[in-house]
Curated annotation (Swiss-Prot):
One of its GO terms (cellular component) is cytosol. It is found in: Cytoplasm, Nucleoid. Homodimer. Its main location: cytoplasm. Belongs to the YbaB/EbfC family. The keyword 4Fe-4S does not apply. Keywords: Cytoplasm, DNA-binding. This is Nucleoid-associated protein SAV_4556. The keyword Ribosomal protein does not apply.
Length: 113
């Protein structure tokens, strides 16, 4: 046994882990509320997703709509959503990365790093 008892250190570690867990939960809630945008075709198609990757809005400029070429429009939509999701992942890394490192670094299920 450690002189002076080992329990205060264990208690301190437990409190630290609980604080990190709470900080992580708070960051995840903030991500779910934060919206980021991606665009394609020079802004003709814009997608908005939450920081957790949920698609919230899609705006298509009428100039992007060509009844004879729906394939290009579909490609622009996919590209805009992908760009928005990349921005959401960058935000996740920014918000959650430091917290994950505090928990022993990466490898946490459900986190993209």
């Amino acid at each position: 046994m450690i002189p002076g008892g080992g329990q205060p250190n264990m208690q301190q570690l437990l409190q630290q882990a609980q604080k990190m867990q709470q900080d992580l939960a708070n960051a995840q809630e903030e991500l779910a509320r934060t919206e980021v945008e991606g665009q394609a075709g020079g802004g003709l198609v814009k997608a908005t997703v939450t920081g957790s990757g949920e698609l919230r809005a899609l705006v298509i400029d009428p100039k992007a709509v060509d009844p004879e070429d729906t394939e290009t429009l579909a490609d622009l939509v996919v590209a805009a959503v992908q760009a928005a999701n990349e921005n959401a992942q960058a935000l996740q890394q920014q918000k959650l990365g430091p917290l994950a490192q505090g928990l022993g670094g990466g490898g946490i299920p459900g986190l993209p790093f």
